[in-house]
Amino acid sequence: MIVVFTGGTGGSKLVQGLQQIVKPEELTVIVNTGDDLEWWGLHVSPDIDSVLYSLADLLSKDRGWGVEDDSFRCLERMTQLGQPSWFSLGDLDLATHLSRTAMLRAGKTLSEATTELAEKFGIRVRVLPMSDDRVSTLLDTATGRLTFQEYFVRERHQVEVRAVHLEGAEHSRPAPGVIESIERAEAIVFAPSNPVTSMGPILAVPGIRDALRRATAPVVAVSPIVGGAAVSGPAGALMKMMGWPSTLAGVATAYKDFLDILVADGADAQAISSQQSAVSPIASGDASASRSPIPDSRSAALRVVCTNTIMRSAADKRDLAEFVLNLCATPQGAEA
């Protein structure tokens, strides 16, 4: 079984690639819910929805979120009625949130609601929220404390962040199936999502990080940082706020106690080779990797590999997914 940890838009691209090459019953996707919010009285799970829409081939290719060819008549009317409208929901997208909210109010858990939505969309891949308990990502900024969506969407992540809080994380429990999936996995993949606000909430759920430390399967992360900057979104700025560099070394630090292999973009090969104190020279596009001494890493030295990680097409997604799984199948030390 292949287990993927992901946030929303960026990570869901790799999920689509894995979907092309892995049997659906052998793929489990564990998704961040720290971004969840109540909007117009509805429970919205942005990252789960991005994953579901991606797997169902419904995701808007132009926007990178929401449903393809959606209309926004309800949003227009809500704006006319004086309701908040900075968080855009399309009409078809609203149907998902209405359905989820109805199931939650009827007593179903978020896991159960997610499974039912996946079935209705014809998705056979197992999609799990990180927890059925509410965990909220809150950010202390120069303008006050904000929810993640207020920071990311309303403020366009342009305000300075001084601290990140994961409200409710300490009392949360992994959703049913999460720990079991980690224990049974043949490969564990961290998609190129924000290490602070996408992966951070997942890893803050008690029991998940410990399970990753104990995992017998190789743990591979695809870096969301290319050329010292985030491919999209505020990952770089948030990593610096955490005291991590906005580099491959910063990504490795975020996952240092369980990570075995870090996949970087080929654009970073030259920079890596010139900074041997951080990461040793590696061959672009080659599964034969050198090793980087990351303090307190799970293994004696982290294996770092370069390939193309920018996913613009279905072929790019498939190629990266194949590359990652081939790495997992390469025996430790085989590249020596």
Which stretches of residues belong to each language-model region?
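Electropositive, gly/pro-rich neighborhoods at or near active sites that engage anionic ligands
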Residues: N32-L166
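A short helix->loop->beta-strand "cap" motif at the edges of active sites that frequently abuts
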Residues: K23-E25, A215-V219, L302
